[in-house]
Amino acid sequence: LKLAALVEGLERMSNAPQSEIDLGAAQLIKTVTGFQPQVTSRALVGKLSSKGAAKGSVADDLRFFRSLALQFETRSALFAGRTDRLHQLALDTNRIAGSPVDEVQLEAALYLHDLGMMFLPESVWLKLEKMSKVERAVLHAHPGFAAGLLERMEGWKGAAEMVQQHHETWDGKGYPAKLDGTEICTGAKIIAIVDAFEAVMLKHGARSHGSSVLRAIAEVNACDKQFAPEWIEPFNAVIRTMLEH
C-alpha cells in the first residue's frame, strides 16, 4: 500500500490552486496505482467545442475517484466490495425515484464521501466506546477533506456538496453543520441511507446474508429522525428487489 503517499498527495491537492489540480491528480494516480493518465488542461477543455474531450475529462476523474475508494477498501478485509455495493444501492435508489440527482455527481460523491477517513487514526474511526470531545471533533472534520478537493476541481460542485453533507441528519443533529433536514441536498440524503445500511450489514456480518439484510433494513426504517422520510420507501423498494433476486 502507498497510503502515506496518498494522504500526502491529497493534502497537497486540497491546498493547490485550481490550475494545478489536473497535474497533481495525474501524478497522484501514477504514484498510488501505477497508471499514467493523460493530463488534459481544464482551461483548454473549456475552450474546446468537442464534447468528447469534456466527457473524457469526466471519465478520467471518475476513474481516479474510484481508485481512491478502492484504496480505502484495503484498510479492512471487511470492506471488500463496499464501493460497488454503495454505488449500486445509491444509483438504484435514485433511479427508482425518477433520478432527481445527477448520476455522475452522485457517483463521484459515493467514491469520495469517506476519503477523509484515511486521514483519521484507527483509534478514532474504529472506536466503539464513547469518544472524547477532541476525537469527536476530528471525526466530524472528515467530510471536509474530500469536499474541499472536489470544490477545487472544476465541474464537481454538486458532488462536493453531497460529500460535505452526507453525515447531516433529518432532525438537525448531524455534522458538521447541524443542517435542518430541508437544507440537506438530495444526493447527501441518499448517501446517508445507503452508508448506514452498509454499516449495519458490516456490524452483523457474522449472521447469514438474509438475516443481516433484514436487520439492516429494520434499523434504517427505525431511524426516522436520522434520514429523509421521502427516501425511505424508494430505498426499501430497492432492497425488496434485491432480496427477490
What are these regions (language model features)?
Residues 1-3:
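Mixed-charge intrinsically disordered linker/loop segments at interdomain junctions
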Residues 5-245:
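Histidine- and acidic-residue-rich, metal-dependent catalytic cores
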